[in-house]
Every structure is written in C-alpha cells, then in structure tokens.
C-alpha cells in the first residue's frame, strides 16, 4: 500500500495490508480512511487487496480498478459495484486535484495495471509486480519526478526458498515480478 498526497487529494494505491494497519498508518499522518479521495488497485492478488473488503465495508471510498481485476474481486467484495469506477489501460481521469493515468503491466493477474499521478508540476509513477516493462508503461513513466519501483525479486532466494515448485516456476516466468537486474542503474535515466 502506498499513499500519494498532493493539494488535498489523498490516493491509496493498493490495500495489501490489513484495514487496521492502513487506518493506523493514515492516523500517523493525521488522516482517516474517510479522507481518502480514492483507492487505486493494480490487480486482485491478496498482497495488493488484503485490507480492501474491511476498508470498503466501513468507508464508501471510490475504487478504481480494471474490469479484469473487478471480475476477480467481486466474490470477495459485496460492496464492489457501489464504489467501483472502472478504468482501462491507456485511460486517464481526474481525482480531486490529481490526474491519474493507467497503464498495463505484465503480471499473472486478471488485468494488471499501474498508475501515474500528476498534480500541478509534479508526477509520481508506480510500477509493481511486472515481469518486464511494457512500452506503454515506459511511455507513461517517462519524465516522472518520483518513480516507485518494486524491486524485491531475488532469484537465488526464490529457488532455495520454501515455495512449492509450481509457484517458483510461475514467479520465474516472464509475467512474474520484475527483477532488480532488469532495470539497471544506467537504464533509469530513460524513465526520469
């Protein structure tokens, strides 16, 4: 979970921790879930949606997600249809003082996306859980002031870790998480 705040607009990107932890983290910033302008969901996997059901049960927050993600979330979120604002890769929409751009990622999920958030002269790009950086993602992230890039993939740790063989193969596949070796230091200039 990540909070992007600017000019009175507070966007929660994913809700991968419990609703209680989200509330505690927001409280440290002087915020409550009712202060959130929206929740942006990248995909349906539990590590991105664990706190979503409880959060939405008590707080009617607009939820932006793709149709593919909504399809998989619907059985777990009875209130989904009342708060869902469907988005699609390549779309852009305003939330408060921010302009949000949606771009596709490569992940083994229903319809995985990530986001660029522009507000005034500043731009933040978020890129998580992608097996590689698709061209539309690279284009959307070009020129951002801050790039939040998940880079916790370690092939040796994965191979020697406790996961079942089938999960290891899935993660090691092209649509698994991006490895820090795929975006080397000298390549970052092309995105910033």
Report the location of each language-model feature.
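Active-site neighborhood of phospho(di)ester-bond hydrolases with catalytic His/Asp-centered motifs
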Residues: 13-16, 37-44, 66, 125-128, ...
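Conserved small/polar residues in nucleotide/adenosyl-binding loops
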Residues: 181-188
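Active-site-proximal loop/helix segment associated with metal-binding centers of metalloenzymes
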Residues: 100-176
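Short, well-ordered alpha-helix to beta-strand connector turns
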Residues: 36, 81, 144-145
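Active-site metal-binding motif and surrounding structural segment of the metallo-beta-lactamase
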Residues: 19-65
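Short, glycine/acidic-enriched loop or turn micro-motifs at the edges of active sites
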Residues: 17-19, 46, 131-132, 153
